[in-house]
Amino acid sequence: MAKAVRCYCIYGLGGRWWSAGMEDVLAVNLRKIKGVICPPTFQYGHWQIIVEAIKNSPNDIHVVAAHSLGAVRATQITDYVKVDLLVLYDLAGGAPSKLGKNTGKCIDIYDTIPDLVPEWRVQAVKGHEKKIERWYSQHGHTGQDDSVPLMRRVEAEVMKLAA
């Protein structure tokens, strides 16, 4: 039997107000992929619920996609459990955890309009640097999660896991 792909999306600091695309663009399309389970998008402060959900399904494939401060919290999830694919939409609002053995692949979608805090780009512990793939966009911080072209790229990565 094929493993389920469990996708967890997380809003940024402004919740749905600033990150509606995490639900309205990304999550709704991930739910259309056969074999993907994607619950409603989480508030950034609820990241520990995702940790517990992953602990309760250790044999499944896990994807966490998050925007802004939610992306910071997404990196913290990997401090506790394994995440096969971590997608960070313009991480901001705090210093992320360094990625290591609990991270399969990380896509860091970095928006350059404007480049608010470049030192907050996600990093990996020594020996895990190649797990981070950097994508660049120019949608603005609050527009990145609404981008259909970016969503299609993320969707393609999830489809590989669901195949």
Task: Spell out what each predicted region is.
Residues 2-60:
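Active-site catalytic motif of lipid deacylating hydrolases and related acyltransferases
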Residues 13, 98-163:
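C-terminal catalytic-base region of ester-bond hydrolases, centering on the histidine
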Residues 26, 81-82, 102:
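Short, structured coil segments at secondary-structure junctions
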Residues 44-46, 90-94:
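Short beta->alpha connector loops
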Residues 65-70, 74:
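Gly/Ala-rich beta-loop-alpha elbow adjacent to hydrolase catalytic centers
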Residues 76-84:
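Conserved hydrolase catalytic core segment
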Residues 89-90, 109:
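Alpha/beta-hydrolase-fold catalytic nucleophile elbow
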